[in-house]
Amino acid sequence: MESSSNSDQNEGTPTSSVSSPYRRTYSDISGLSHRFDVQSFYNRPSNTNAVVLSGHEEDVSEDAEEPKDDVVNDVHGDGDEEDSDIDSAEDAELEMMRERFAKLLLGEDMSGSGKGVCTAVTVSNSITNLYATVFGQSLRLQPLSTEKKDLWKREMNCFMSICDYIVEVIPRSLGTNVEITETKLRSDILMSLPALRKLDNMLMEILDSFTENEFWYVERGSSSMNSGGGGRDSGTFRKVVVQRKDEKWWLPVPCVPAEGLSEEERKHLRHKRDCASQIHKAALAINDSTLNDMDIPDSYLTTLPKSGKASVGDVIYKQLCTAEKFYPDQLLDILKITSEHEALELADKVEASLVTWRRKTGGLTHSKSSWDMMKDISGDADRGNDKNHILAARARSLLFCLKQRYPELSQTSLDICKIQFNRDVGKAVLESYSRVLEGLAYNVVSWIDDVLYVDRTVRNRDD
């Protein structure tokens, strides 16, 4: 009986030894960057379940041995099935990760002919596609499903693990005449990546907070919407929602009770909106800083006109040149921008003229951080009567105010060109991660605004 138990024990050991490395790796996906210590693995204590059962055999009668043997066999039988299921799941996950990294290395060219894009662009596209997969169908204030949340965390941890190897070498003194060098994460990754992870977790917490809501949604064109009933005490308030000028037809319709939301619910919505708005600003700042650190591609420079005046036009150029004190907000009011398309077109023109004037002043010799660029807004104007310096400073302030006034503005032609020709994998991770978080935060703010708008309209109608 003891020998059979020992044999059961020995049979269970190989199963655990095979599955353990995969389990250790994928319990925390960043474990891909850790080395697996084979010696310490085989020195682990073996499974003690069978030993405990066999240790009592001397104290029981022969009649009791058979039930014990059945129990041992049942325990090992169930354990083998569970281990087999775990191994199958881990093998499938491992195969998926192998395929994912193969696509990254091949540059999305599975033919292997070398026609794929560079690794940085592949990583950027992968993060963008992952965001579309996880959040593309999420059009309302509600928590993510467990499957999508696990997918997002697992895949993003995989992409973040790439940054563990992007380091810079710095000198370190030992207190003697001998100095050594050590490696640490590159400064931009060390500062921005933890901040982005924190913003990501905060956005997930905001979505998770919308579980027991006083509002609900109905799909446009559904029977409940057409009949004016949303499944609760009040209707969908369809007639008021349709009157919104900025209505997005692809979004579901938010509905509130006939008497409106309670004060506690409105307070909760406003608080979450403020949090999401701050997250949006932080992600936008990181994204702008990362884009400003990227070099301007030569292909973009060759498309620029010789003068900045040709880019912005006579009206804007006159305002930039003649005014003693330049007020960008007043210029935006004069232009009377009516759509996002017009705002994006203006941003492209101003950015092109800005690059042209900076080239003439020798300001494109190296990349600048966003903080350095903001200091130049006031610093360039103090360099005397250099016309190009003044025009560049005013164009930069105009572009900054334009992006502040239209936070939903799409990426400019220069930004797209930088991302397309970027070869720095670390910057690609930071830029794409901050961009998708910026988009998610903006969507959350918009969804909350939609609910508050319907609530405000319902209460005003009752008054």
Curated annotation (Swiss-Prot):
The record ties this protein, via Pfam families, to: PRONE (PF03759)
Q: Which InterPro entries match?
A: PRONE_dom, RopGEF
Q: Where is the composition biased (Basic and acidic residues)?
A: 69-78
Which UniProt keywords are given for this protein, alphabetically ordered? Cell membrane, Cytoplasm, Guanine-nucleotide releasing factor, Membrane, Stress response
- Location within or outside the cell: Cytoplasm; Cell membrane
| Domain called PRONE: residue spans | 84-463
Q: Which domain of life, per UniProt?
A: Eukaryota
Gene Ontology BP annotations: defense response to fungus; plant-type cell wall organization; root hair elongation
Found, by tissue, as follows: Expressed in root vascular tissue and trichoblast cell files. Expressed in root metaxylem cell files. Expressed in guard cells of cotyledons, rosette leaves, sepals, petal, stigmas and siliques. Expressed in root metaxylem cell files.
Q: Where is the composition biased (Acidic residues)?
A: 59-68
Q: Where is this region: Disordered?
A: 1-25, 55-87
User: What effect does gene inactivation have here?
Assistant: No visible phenotype under normal growth conditions, but mutant plant roots have reduced density of secondary wall pits in metaxylem vessels.
The UniProt subunit note reads as follows: Interacts with ARAC10/ROP11.
What does UniProt say about this protein's domains? The PRONE (plant-specific Rop nucleotide exchanger) domain is responsible for the GEF activity.
UniProt protein name = Rop guanine nucleotide exchange factor 4
